[in-house]
Amino acid sequence: MILDNLFKNLIYDPVSALGILVFYILLVNLPISLGAVFKKKSFFIVKLLTILVNLLITLQLLFRWSISGHFPVSNLYESLYFLAWGISMGQLYIEREYSSPIIPSIAIPIELLTVAFACFVLPDDLKLSSNLVPALRSSWLVMHVSVVMLSYAALIIGSLLSASVLFINRNKPLQIRSSSTGIGGFKFFNNNYLNDLADPVEFSHSEELDTLSYRSILIGFVLLTLGLISGAVWANEAWGTWWSWDPKETWAFITWLFYAAYLHMRISKGWQGRRPALLATSGFLVVIVCYLGVNFLGIGLHSYGWIFG
């Protein structure tokens, strides 16, 4: 019955139908991904389903783009699916570098929650595409919003990877060798390994995850920086001001400062182990408030719509 309705809706409303189909695939993939942590044979199935999810979201966004005539990040519904697309793409990319079932086990639940929020929590009127106001009919829409959303995806993945490091080492001391570059990281590496340069160094599972977390956050920070700069340029063109302290702008700046502090502590101060992992993990809440918190306020130029309105 569900499949029949989905296939019928694919003809009349392909965007919504594909969105719901993505939800059901993620719902199936969730227990498989969690089980793959203990039974690695199912890891391949998890990866195939993630690829399918990413392709279906790509198709959904292309349909919305074709129907609306503008890049599909103009409302909360579209941006949620774009975020899910970014997280799934990041998950697949990281799995190419380091094949671990831990990665999908933390990424897929967030993808599922994101899609479920878009499908079943948002009011129907916020799911509809609408004409853009003149200020948003700009090529900056693609540059600014897409880069910021991808930065959120990278920062979320990095924060969750740090959370996984803390969980794996919850009942034992967390010793992480340096995975950062810079003065502090060099000093730490130099003090511990200068006498062992002739020997190959094998990093533990936690150290690999910590390295992936650091790199993901670094990429997210760079993207967020580009997003803030492009947003300022766009705002100046559209409204004649570079910065207006809009709630979203303010929280984006707070998010930027938060992760700048994290990177400073790792690169310059040589922080390793539990402290940076705790800081990165708490960054997840900062990103969520930045992305969704403004929508609960229902104010500001960046509000996608008050979900209770």
Curated annotation (Swiss-Prot):
<feature type="transmembrane region" description="Helical">
    <location>
        <begin position="148"/>
        <end position="168"/>
    </location>
</feature>
<dbReference type="Pfam" id="PF01578">
    <property type="entry name" value="Cytochrom_C_asm"/>
</dbReference>
<keyword id="KW-1133">Transmembrane helix</keyword>
<keyword id="KW-0812">Transmembrane</keyword>
<feature type="transmembrane region" description="Helical">
    <location>
        <begin position="279"/>
        <end position="299"/>
    </location>
</feature>
<feature type="transmembrane region" description="Helical">
    <location>
        <begin position="102"/>
        <end position="122"/>
    </location>
</feature>
<protein>
    <recommendedName>
        <fullName>Cytochrome c biogenesis protein CcsA</fullName>
    </recommendedName>
</protein>
<dbReference type="GO" id="GO:0020037">
    <property type="term" value="F:heme binding"/>
</dbReference>
<comment type="subunit">
    <text>May interact with ccs1.</text>
</comment>
<keyword id="KW-0201">Cytochrome c-type biogenesis</keyword>
<feature type="transmembrane region" description="Helical">
    <location>
        <begin position="43"/>
        <end position="63"/>
    </location>
</feature>
<keyword id="KW-0793">Thylakoid</keyword>
<dbReference type="InterPro" id="IPR002541">
    <property type="entry name" value="Cyt_c_assembly"/>
</dbReference>
<dbReference type="GO" id="GO:0017004">
    <property type="term" value="P:cytochrome complex assembly"/>
</dbReference>
<feature type="transmembrane region" description="Helical">
    <location>
        <begin position="216"/>
        <end position="236"/>
    </location>
</feature>
<feature type="transmembrane region" description="Helical">
    <location>
        <begin position="250"/>
        <end position="267"/>
    </location>
</feature>
<dbReference type="InterPro" id="IPR045062">
    <property type="entry name" value="Cyt_c_biogenesis_CcsA/CcmC"/>
</dbReference>
<comment type="function">
    <text>Required during biogenesis of c-type cytochromes (cytochrome c6 and cytochrome f) at the step of heme attachment.</text>
</comment>
<comment type="similarity">
    <text>Belongs to the CcmF/CycK/Ccl1/NrfE/CcsA family.</text>
</comment>
<dbReference type="InterPro" id="IPR017562">
    <property type="entry name" value="Cyt_c_biogenesis_CcsA"/>
</dbReference>
<keyword id="KW-0472">Membrane</keyword>
<dbReference type="GO" id="GO:0031676">
    <property type="term" value="C:plasma membrane-derived thylakoid membrane"/>
</dbReference>
<feature type="transmembrane region" description="Helical">
    <location>
        <begin position="18"/>
        <end position="38"/>
    </location>
</feature>
<feature type="transmembrane region" description="Helical">
    <location>
        <begin position="67"/>
        <end position="87"/>
    </location>
</feature>
